[in-house]
């Protein structure tokens, strides 16, 4: 199916797969997923990649609710670097093996530091991309962190 799904199956992590018809004209991928799946946007999590200290070859991954904005200062602090900036589209796609709008935190080509916003812990399960547009994975946040080697911290604007 996708590297994300393959990883979850291989690691025997419980998850539920959800599909929906992606509108190619919609560029608000996380919002679209929440709307089409009929879930609270605070449970629909997006995957963002940043460049550490401006180096587009040294990326880190942040997973946060689609309703939130990533705070770059908090993000940098959470991974112990001076500053971060959003990774460019090509660098993100090359590092993950996924297209923008379908980037999953799971099964990326290159393993990178990953941080999940602490609001994920408010829910029994959250939704993340399954590795392509129109495919979402419902998973317990603790299981997601375990398989990614990720930490939970506050990385969003107030």
Curated annotation (Swiss-Prot):
Effect in UniProt of substituting residue 47 to A: 21-fold decrease in Cys-tRNA(Pro) deacylation activity
Result of altering residue 134 to A: 7.4-fold decrease in Cys-tRNA(Pro) deacylation activity
Signal sequence, renumbered to the chain: none
EC number in record: 4.2.-.-
One GO MF term: lyase activity
NCBIfam families: YbaK_EbsC (TIGR00011)
Biological role: Functions in trans to edit the amino acid from incorrectly charged Cys-tRNA(Pro) via a Cys-tRNA(Pro) deacylase activity. Probably compensates for the lack of Cys-tRNA(Pro) editing by ProRS. Is also able to deacylate Cys-tRNA(Cys), and displays weak deacylase activity in vitro against Gly-tRNA(Gly), as well as, at higher concentrations, some other correctly charged tRNAs. Does not cleave Pro-tRNA(Pro).
Protein name, as recorded: Cys-tRNA(Pro)/Cys-tRNA(Cys) deacylase YbaK
Species, as recorded: Haemophilus influenzae (strain ATCC 51907 / DSM 11121 / KW20 / Rd)
